[in-house]
A protein has these predicted regions:
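Short alpha-helical segments enriched in small residues
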Residues: 1-154
Length: 154
């Protein structure tokens, strides 16, 4: 899964470190990063937080926030990025939460809705993306969007 973008991200990290928190991508970002030779110098690790329980217990995402906004939301993506950065002591935290299919959620999100979160020493933010395609296509597009967003902020 090594791509030009993934290689560029690893190179751009330099002496900084990255950790990821993934939901709908199920470890695909971590797999992409670790496919690059030398990535062990910059990649600390990842959490596949597929359930709300893991988002809360391992990443510190507020249970109230999860109940109020749903797992697929901008503030949850932000808290995931902040949480994985704090838990691992990384310079950067990157997160993805979304709906790859087959159906939407009770909060009005449709299939293809993905939020990518980013955190560093200066703060955090998240962006919403709407992707089309089947489950695998949405997941691949989410990985690419997350890596692109990271690259733009390195």
């Amino acid at each position: 899964m090594m791509t030009r973008l993934t290689c560029d991200v690893v190179k751009a990290l330099g002496d900084k470190t990255l950790s990821v928190a993934e939901s709908c991508t199920g470890g695909m970002i971590g797999a992409a990063i670790t496919s690059v030779p030398g990535s062990s110098k910059v990649f600390k690790g990842g959490v596949i937080s597929y359930t709300n329980e893991v988002k809360s217990s391992l990443l510190g995402v507020s249970k109230d926030l999860l109940a109020r906004e749903g797992a697929v939301s901008l503030p949850v993506a932000q808290e995931m990025a902040v949480g994985v950065r704090a838990a691992t002591g990384s310079d950067y935290g990157l997160s993805v939460t979304g709906l790859a299919g087959p159906g939407g959620d009770e909060y009005g999100n449709s299939v293809g809705t993905v939020f990518v979160g980013y955190a560093d020493e200066n703060g955090f933010f998240a962006r919403k993306f709407l992707f089309d395609g089947d489950r695998e296509s949405v997941r691949l597009k989410a990985v690419n969007a997350a890596l692109q967003m990271l690259m733009e902020n390195l």
